[in-house]
A protein has these predicted regions:
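ATP/NTP phosphate-donor binding region
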Residues: 1-65, 69, 106-121, 132-136
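Short glycine/serine/threonine-rich phosphate/pyrophosphate-binding segments
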Residues: 20-23, 73-79, 127, 182-186
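Catalytic core of DAGKc-family lipid kinases
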Residues: 95-172
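Proline-centered loop/turn at the N-terminus of a beta-strand
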Residues: 37, 86-88
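Short, solvent-exposed amphipathic alpha-helical segments in soluble enzyme
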Residues: 26-31, 83-84, 189-193, 219, ...
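Gly/Ser/Thr-rich active-site loops/lids in small-molecule metabolic enzymes
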Residues: 153, 163, 167-211
Length: 308
């Protein structure tokens, strides 16, 4: 492993709706037994007895590591929370199909012990830093500009590092990181880009004129989107979170922050294998042995014992 520093204070980030109390209490008990303080956002204080409630800014500033309890959406929220001061983030899988989360609840005890001991590999993730007037947003997957029904379309001119590239007229425009290329961008017809390659993917959805194919640009590039006079009112979303509207005359700027996220990997080879299988869910069918790989470890063991 990479010999990361020990974690002395860990933050818990919880799925916003699902009941994760049982697993959260296990984290608190295991961490406290090793003399490690557990922080939680004040809005979640009632869900985690024994954790220290703090404001979001304090949590991001004080934590040496984060444990995310949920799916990929919760994991993305945890990464955004500490993007200004990146610390290792461990994802515990309590949601739906996910590419970022790695650990199942049955593996929590050993996974948390390794996190606290610094016995893990870090997987760096780039983020998009988005500016639209006075608004600021961070996205680890993607930025989307989407039309409202009956209120016009996306009509925007793209400049790359200050040089005009072309224009878009479409229903939605998605700017994705390489890691986020398997999400909204892929659904809109964009390519899958390996995070090890890096890059920014710009994909129009339902293009009518202008640039009609996806673009793959360098992470060193900065993007400027000028919304033209014929542009409709658009929803601005970062990782699926709404950040209000933009419209004609507005300018949206996007730059990449490299290594803005530090994702904990305990067994990178196994995670990569599972991720490849999960990607195949986007284009069914799956082989039975591939479906078996997606099951939690304890379920696979029971199935193998029965078949043996």
């Amino acid at each position: 492993m990479d010999g990361s520093p020990r974690v002395a204070r860990v933050a818990l980030v919880l799925h916003p709706r699902n009941d994760v109390t049982e697993v959260a209490e296990r984290v608190v008990g295991l961490a406290n037994a090793q003399g490690v303080e557990v922080l939680v956002r004040a809005l979640d204080a009632g869900r985690v007895p024994g954790a220290v409630p703090v404001g979001s800014d304090e949590l991001a500033a004080e934590a040496d590591g984060v444990v995310s309890l949920g799916g990929d959406g919760t994991m993305l929220g945890a990464l955004r929370l500490v993007a200004d001061k990146p610390v290792p983030v461990l994802g515990v899988h309590l949601g739906n199909l996910g590419f970022l989360v790695e650990v199942h609840p049955s593996e929590l005890d050993s996974a948390l012990a390794r996190l606290l001991d610094g016995d893990f590999v870090e997987e760096p993730h780039s983020a998009l830093r988005i500016t639209a007037g006075e608004r600021r947003a961070v996205a680890f997957n993607d930025l989307a500009l989407a039309r409202h029904p009956g209120r016009g379309t996306v009509d925007a001119t793209l400049a790359v590092s200050g040089l005009r590239y072309g224009y878009y007229r479409c229903d939605a425009l998605v700017v994705a990181t390489a890691a986020g290329s398997s999400a909204y961008s892929y659904a809109a017809g964009g390519p899958l880009v390996s995070p090890s390659v890096g890059g920014i993917v710009v994909t129009p959805s339902a293009p009518m004129s202008g640039i009609s194919r996806p673009l793959v640009l360098s992470e060193a590039d900065t993007l400027q989107l000028e919304l033209n006079p014929r542009c409709g009112a658009l929803a601005l979303e970062a990782d699926g979170i709404g950040h209000g509207e933009v419209g004609p005359g507005d300018r949206v700027e996007i730059a990449v922050q490299a290594a803005a996220g530090r994702v904990v990997r305990l067994d990178p080879d196994v995670h990569a294998q599972r991720s490849r299988v999960k990607l195949s869910l986007l284009d069914l069918p799956l082989l039975p042995e591939q479906l078996r790989e997606l099951l939690p470890g304890e379920v696979r063991e029971r199935l193998e014992a029965r078949s043996g």
